[in-house]
């Protein structure tokens, strides 16, 4: 069984939106979160989707599920105090749906330019290696800095990747790590791959497209709209 856990828990402070979290902003009559879920909905290998949502917007999210006929969404749950805790709540909900050896794909609700090919590659990688971290090769040189903002290391670009999403694992593995971490007071890991790395779990890269952006700022929003329009034009004009 393959389950998508889609995190839509942010409130969009960096987007400067008033009243509506960024994941609910609309592009061509459809909220960003729905654009994202649609990809999972239309991927044959995905059996179910869990959405983790801002608690005040649960009813709104449930209405979207019904309005856009998102039949693979089997649960909409409230997020936690941190991103990690929100994902944990989604994983717990997935556990209620899962069969043995379930694969979970943890994805950002504001990454709507994911595609079926990457989703399938994640599932394949988990079954072969136990993990999949969707990533892109660094286009520019990555540097590490010290506390004085001085460069302490220039990283070899040929070995540098940028981690994105989905980040995928066997559900039992990521839940085991999450529960142990929480029991030790670790509740604010930046993402699931970071947490698994803290536990020395082997992480495998799955290369994804550069356009798999996370919509965090107004610039990201307009970039998504431009890329979405370009995709639509390709289909219309047969480009």
From Swiss-Prot:
InterPro entries on file: IspD/TarI, ISPD_synthase_CS, Nucleotide-diphossugar_trans, TarI
Record EC number: 2.7.7.40
GO BP annotations, alphabetical order: cell wall organization; isoprenoid biosynthetic process; poly(ribitol phosphate) teichoic acid biosynthetic process
Gene3D superfamilies listed in its UniProt record: Spore Coat Polysaccharide Biosynthesis Protein SpsA, Chain A
Alphabetically ordered keywords of this record: Cell wall biogenesis/degradation, Nucleotidyltransferase, Teichoic acid biosynthesis, Transferase
Pathway(s): Cell wall biogenesis; poly(ribitol phosphate) teichoic acid biosynthesis
Binding-site positions, CTP: 7-10, 80-86
Parts of the chain that traverse the membrane: none
Site (described: Positions ribitol 5-phosphate for the nucleophilic attack): 157, 214
Its job: Catalyzes the transfer of the cytidylyl group of CTP to D-ribitol 5-phosphate.
HAMAP family on file: TarI
GO CC, any one term: cytosol
Originating organism: Streptococcus agalactiae serotype III (strain NEM316)
Site (Transition state stabilizer): 14, 22
Gene behind the chain: tarI
Catalytic activity annotation: D-ribitol 5-phosphate + CTP + H(+) = CDP-L-ribitol + diphosphate
Entry's family note: Belongs to the IspD/TarI cytidylyltransferase family. TarI subfamily.
Stated name of the protein: Ribitol-5-phosphate cytidylyltransferase
CDD domains noted in UniProt: CDP-ME_synthetase
